């Protein structure tokens, strides 16, 4: 089970797709969409990222920052971001320490095979650093619209 709403979002530091260290606390004062996804350039993850990209102007207008996190490398994030022209930072959690911190790393099943990986989850964090909403078992195609609606932003 991921961390619940109503608690402070744990701070962390990860490298972004420009190889720059980013701390969550650097973004205090802004609403943040912190979304965890399994892997760069895979069908569901691409759909989710591209929907955030397509709605990016609405997020920007509302002052909402999007941060994507996966266990991929910085190099992988660079390729993914360039290929799909993603306008928001992607953070490399190669050792899945932040996934563990937010409790979104766990057992998964695909084509009958069980393995450990990222459980697609999004945290909405307010300007005070509090988790205000958690989306579990995210459906990539509809997710950006759900997030905007949760922030009260028209789509």
Model-inferred region functions:
Residues 1-155:
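Chalcogenol-based redox active-site neighborhoods
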């Amino acid at each position: 089970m991921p961390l619940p709403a109503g608690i402070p979002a744990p701070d962390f530091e990860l490298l972004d797709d420009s190889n720059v260290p980013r701390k969550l606390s650097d973004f205090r004062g802004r609403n943040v969409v912190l979304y965890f996804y399994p892997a760069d350039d895979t069908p569901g993850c691409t759909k989710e990222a591209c929907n955030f990209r397509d709605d990016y102007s609405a997020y920007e207008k509302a002052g909402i920052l999007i941060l994507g996190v996966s266990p991929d490398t910085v190099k992988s994030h660079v390729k993914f971001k360039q290929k799909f022209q993603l306008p928001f930072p992607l953070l490399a959690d190669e050792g899945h320490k932040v996934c563990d911190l937010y409790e979104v790393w766990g057992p998964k099943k695909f084509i009958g095979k069980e393995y450990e990986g990222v459980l697609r989850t999004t945290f909405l964090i307010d300007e005070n650093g509090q988790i205000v909403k958690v989306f579990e078992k995210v459906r990539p195609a509809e997710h950006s619209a759900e997030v905007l609606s949760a922030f009260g932003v028209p789509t």
